[in-house]
Structure formats: C-alpha cells, structure tokens
Amino acid sequence: MSDSGGGSHKSSTTKPSVFGLNLYLVIAICSVFILLISLLIFLFVCLNRVSRARRMRVKHSSGSIPLVSKEISEIKTVGKFINSDDSKGKIGNEVVVVVSATSKEATSGFDTLSVASSGDVGTSEAMGWGKWYSLKDLEIATRGFSDDNMIGEGGYGVVYRADFSDGSVAAVKNLLNNKGQAEKEFKVEVEAIGKVRHKNLVGLMGYCADSAQSQRMLVYEYIDNGNLEQWLHGDVGPVSPLTWDIRMKIAIGTAKGLAYLHEGLEPKVVHRDVKSSNILLDKKWNAKVSDFGLAKLLGSETSYVTTRVMGTFGYVSPEYASTGMLNECSDVYSFGVLLMEIITGRSPVDYSRPPGEMNLVDWFKGMVASRRGEEVIDPKIKTSPPPRALKRALLVCLRCIDLDSSKRPKMGQIIHMLEAEDFPFRPEHRSNQERSK
C-alpha cells in the first residue's frame, strides 16, 4: 500500500519535458532563436537599403549634395575650372541656386526654392550663390569646431573661424537643429541673400549640407573686427574708440545695407532682426548687416505679411509686436532704436538702470522733449559732436520710431537725412527768409 502510494506521488510531481528537456528551457531556446532570426532579417533589410542608396548616388552624380528639404527640389554640383594665380588647375564645386517664387508665394514665407546647375562660368556667377563645402573640409578648417575657433554664439547656431589650406578665412555658422530650425534658417538665408552682393551686407560664400549627420552650415565672408554690440557695451575703457564720426559712419553703412534690401531687390527683403550684435565691423569701421535667419520676402503688390512675431526684445516695432503684421517699416523702427543705441551707448532695455531709464526709447523721447538732447550722448565719446549734427541724428531717431508706421521714412530717405548737412533745419531756414522779406 505504502509503495504504490509513493509511486503515485512521484509520477504526479514529474515536470513536463520535450525530448528529455525541460519545457521552459525549450521555450527559452526557441525565443532566442526567433529573436536572432528577426535581427538577421532587420540587418539584411538595412544593408540592402544602404546599398541601394549608394547605387542611386553613383548613378545620378558622384558629387551630389543631400537634399535640404521638400522645397529644394534638386541640387547638383558642377565642376568649374578655376583659373587664378592662387589656384591654377583646381576644380571647384559650384552650386547654382535659382529662386522661383511668385510674389504671393514669397510673402507666405519662402514657399519654393529650386536649384539648378550650369557649366558656364558666367551664368554660374550670375545665377549662383556660392560653393559647396564638405563637412570634412569645414572640420579641418575649424580644427574640429574647437572652442578656440568659436567667434560667436546665438539662439540659432554657433559661429566658428575657418582657416582654409589656401590661406583664405571664412566664418562658418553651424545651425542648431532645434525642431527643424536649422532646415528653416538654411532655406531662408539662401533665398534672402543667396544672390545678394552689397558692401554693407555680409556675403554668403557657400554652404554645407550633410544629411547623414543632420548638419546644416552656412559659410560667410570673415569680418575681422567683431560686432557693434561688443564695441558699444564691451569693456573698451573710459574712452570709446568709436568716435562720433565713426558711429555715424556705422549708422549710414547699416542704413545703406537695409535700403538695398528694401528698395534694391524684388521681392524686397525684410530683415526682421536689426540689432547691434548683427552689425559686423571691419578694421576700417565699415558696417555689414548679418544674420538673415528671420528674414521675410515681401512682394511689390503686398503691403505686409502676417507672421509669428519674432525678433529681439527692445528692437521690435509696436505694431508688429501687437498684430504680427510685418513690412519694411518694422526694420525702420528697429534701425531707429539701433541709432539711439549708437548715440547713447545704452542697451534698448537695461534693468540695471532706474525705472524711468530702463526702456531706451521712452527715456530718449523724454530727454529730447525736455530739451536735454545733449545729455543723451554716450559719456565715452571724448569729443562731443557739433550741435547741428546731434540735432540731425536725434531727429532721425524720432522719425524712425514714430508710432504711426506710415509716417516713418524709407531707408533711402534716412541715408539722405544722415548725410545732408542742412536737412533738419530747412523749414526753419525758409521761415527766417520769409520773415526777412
């Protein structure tokens, strides 16, 4: 009885098995096997896609550039023989960009951007905007994008000095790809200033678009004397090297650059971020407007474009800030604030100052209204300007920041105001003549 009971107990506790192996062990082995098979299939598919992509690149062009966006439909490189003393016999990759946006499309924010190629040198220079740089080229020129080569940093990217093997120097902006911002700014700058050449605008030399690394970089001419913000607000000692005449030269140069964008192009370009840090200076204090990442195109038949409010606090015009309606008048307002900054040496908004002086525009208007205009001059200017020159500059500031945007002058008129010796005093001069009669 006891033996049969014991045998019965043994048989009931025996674990299930397959081919003498524990069932759970068999399941584990099968799971690992299935996982390995799935991994092999996945690797095979990936390798197949990479191989197919390589074959397509070789088939179309061994020097093709990765596509930038859906709007940039085609990019080709063309070998161009460079016949110069410095680079005889070299082949350069030139990228030719043709902007094909109607005015309506342009006002909506750079809807179309097509790229074509040309083997003709003259046509390439007339239609194109710069050279294609490989990521490796720029890594070498910037010493691996080292901190020692970093010359600027902002919300949309980091700027590095690039020293190329041929002795040329450039500034490389590595765009930060926050929520696709690099792609947007890349396209905006190409459309805005890709074909523009003006002595008061920073020249765009070329670009780098590396899809594998998700890199978008813009290559500009190198301006070797920093920006206006550094010279106005940096530690330059008790006496600023920016004399009154130099400051007016910078202001006029900036105005000429903006006037070209507004009045010399079709469609016109609204910069949308005019400020002291975006005014670069060379050793002769020539001003060059830079950073077109927020720029908008405005067709001739359109008086404004409605867009999300962007810019820098203190420089943004009140009508744009409140309605989102943008046109060149917004740049004029920003220039007026910039001119105040040049004259006073003060930032547009400075929370370290007393409450009545925090906002530059309000303080400036109050000082001029109370006939204390001579007191607004930057104390770091050693030699004060002639009274007529000061009055002329003050008048330009006030006209640029008129709350009625339609009453603000055009940039071309501003240039005339700043350069014409007798502009602010013509009405007074006429009235004196009338009284003498």
From Swiss-Prot:
InterPro entries: Kinase-like_dom_sf (IPR011009), Prot_kinase_dom (IPR000719), Protein_kinase_ATP_BS (IPR017441), RLK_Ser/Thr-Kinase (IPR052232), Ser-Thr/Tyr_kinase_cat_dom (IPR001245), Ser/Thr_kinase_AS (IPR008271). The modification Phosphothreonine is found at T307, T312. It is found in: Cell membrane. It is a single-pass membrane protein. The chain crosses the membrane at residues 25-45. Keywords: ATP-binding, Cell membrane, Kinase, Membrane, Nucleotide-binding, Phosphoprotein, Serine/threonine-protein kinase, Transferase, Transmembrane, Transmembrane helix. Residues 145-426 form the Protein kinase domain. It catalyses: L-seryl-[protein] + ATP = O-phospho-L-seryl-[protein] + ADP + H(+); L-threonyl-[protein] + ATP = O-phospho-L-threonyl-[protein] + ADP + H(+). The active site is at D273 (proton acceptor). The modification Phosphoserine is found at S277. GO terms for molecular function: ATP binding; protein serine kinase activity; protein serine/threonine kinase activity. It holds the Pfam family PK_Tyr_Ser-Thr. GO terms for cellular component: plasma membrane. Belongs to the protein kinase superfamily. Ser/Thr protein kinase family. This is Probable receptor-like serine/threonine-protein kinase At4g34500. The lineage of its organism: Eukaryota, Viridiplantae, Streptophyta, Embryophyta, Tracheophyta.
